[in-house]
């Protein structure tokens, strides 16, 4: 028997995470995991299908992965804006893909769901979806969610929204924490069935992505915002990122007024540790075994908010989703990849072309941005790797699988990307 106690006045998430804790506890006993992830099946205009599962700490872009991208008035996607000059980089994505959401936040990877494909298979662990809507600041930002909340077919719960009982709640009217300062964490709880094109079965995962919020980074103000639009991770590095699970920059779910508020912090193993019981090393072993048992699933890393000196919000995530689905997946020849200057970032693609438009090289390899340069990049890389080394020490115990010891030791020894590939040679 499991008991769940919801002690605060925010009952939706508190009770939900209590149920998540139960699933993690049962999974730990039986050898499986409920992942902190959204999942979406993408069907391109060319009828190609790709399923992406996006993991990460709160604010890492899970809900955004299942959303249509936000077009400008001219129909293009605003990919990035130079924070110094104001120069905008836009891409034209003429025909958008159809999105079929599978999970929003909790992806059940039960053994009974797995098949012989060599890919991870998941199902939704939730009936209601708990959506953050801080990015919806005016009418027309996300028409699907706006329509569902303005004309609800079933009762919904609105949190941190400026509304009164019996009224129509406009989800871009967020309450204010102070005059002129909107609450960073407005939420809506809605039944999953009100989402369009919802998948009521399982999702067979082609790509597991991991999201991190990154700060602005320039040669004048070096920081860890050195991650390109997306990076390809060898499975060994994908596991490392899930152990450390950085919360990243300006996390809207975390209130921290201390002097260390801007410092990097970890959400804990799997990015679900705040809800787990037991030992971290047991969860680390389960995640490593899961990766080894699903060799046909590939791994990427996606930043949001900033790419070097460019502000992009979640546009890079949406562009990556559209690009990889049109490409038909992630299987790259190694000669088309560049080892990242910071080895825990895996590989970068040498070049990307979307609907005939070339993505600037500096958005793929941040050290190539003139406003960043190699010296500032290396300083940011040291911030990132030092944080990883500090976080990984707690897992290096006798209970960890031998392969896990080898992977962690490679991080501590500053090994190059090829070493991580050799430990689990799949790309």
PLM regions and their residue ranges:
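Charged, amphipathic alpha-helical linker segments immediately N-terminal to NTP-binding catalytic cores
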Residues: 1-36
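Conserved nucleotide-sensing/catalytic segment adjacent to the nucleotide-binding pocket
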Residues: 78, 83-178
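Conserved NTP phosphate-binding and transfer environment spanning the P-loop NTPase/kinase superfamily
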Residues: 131-427
């Amino acid at each position: 028997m499991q008991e769940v106690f919801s002690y605060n006045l925010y009952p939706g998430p508190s009770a939900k995470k209590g149920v998540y804790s139960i699933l993690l506890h049962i999974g730990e006993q039986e050898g499986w995991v409920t992942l902190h992830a959204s999942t979406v099946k993408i069907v391109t205009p060319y009828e190609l299908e790709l399923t992406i599962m996006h993991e990460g700490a709160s604010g890492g872009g899970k809900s955004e992965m299942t959303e249509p991208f936000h077009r400008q008035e001219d129909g293009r996607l605003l990919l990035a804006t130079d924070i110094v000059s104001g120069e905008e980089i836009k891409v034209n994505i003429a025909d958008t893909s159809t999105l079929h959401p599978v999970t929003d936040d909790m992806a059940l990877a039960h053994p009974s769901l797995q098949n012989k494909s060599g890919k991870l298979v998941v199902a939704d662990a939730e009936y209601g979806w708990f959506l953050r809507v801080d990015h919806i600041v005016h009418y027309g930002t996300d028409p699907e969610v706006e329509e569902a909340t303005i004309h609800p077919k079933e009762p919904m719960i609105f949190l941190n929204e400026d509304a009164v009982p019996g009224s129509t709640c406009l989800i871009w009217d967020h309450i204010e924490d102070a005059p002129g300062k909107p609450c960073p964490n407005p939420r809506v709880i809605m039944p999953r069935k009100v989402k369009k094109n919802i998948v009521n079965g399982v999702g067979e995962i082609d790509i597991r992505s991991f999201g991190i919020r990154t700060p602005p980074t320039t040669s004048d103000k070096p920081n860890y915002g050195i991650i390109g639009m997306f990076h390809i991770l060898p499975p060994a590095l994908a596991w490392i990122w899930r152990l450390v699970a950085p919360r990243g920059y300006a996390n809207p779910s975390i209130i921290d007024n201390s002097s260390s508020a801007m410092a990097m912090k970890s959400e804990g193993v799997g990015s679900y540790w705040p809800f787990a019981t037991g030992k971290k090393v047991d969860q680390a072993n389960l995640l490593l075994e899961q990766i080894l048992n699903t060799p046909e699933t590939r791994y990427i890393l996606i930043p949001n908010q900033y790419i070097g000196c460019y502000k992009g919000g979640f546009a890079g995530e949406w562009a990556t989703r559209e690009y990889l689905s049109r490409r038909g997946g992630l299987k790259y020849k190694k000669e088309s990849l560049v080892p990242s200057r910071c080895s825990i970032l895996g590989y970068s693609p040498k070049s990307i072309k979307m609907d005939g438009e070339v993505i600037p090289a500096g958005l793929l390899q941040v050290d190539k941005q003139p406003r960043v340069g190699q010296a500032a990049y290396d300083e940011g890389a040291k911030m990132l790797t030092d944080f990883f080394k500090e976080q990984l020490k707690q897992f290096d115990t006798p209970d960890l699988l031998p392969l896990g010891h080898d992977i962690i030791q490679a991080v501590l020894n500053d090994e190059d990307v090829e070493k991580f590939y050799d430990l689990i040679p799949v790309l």
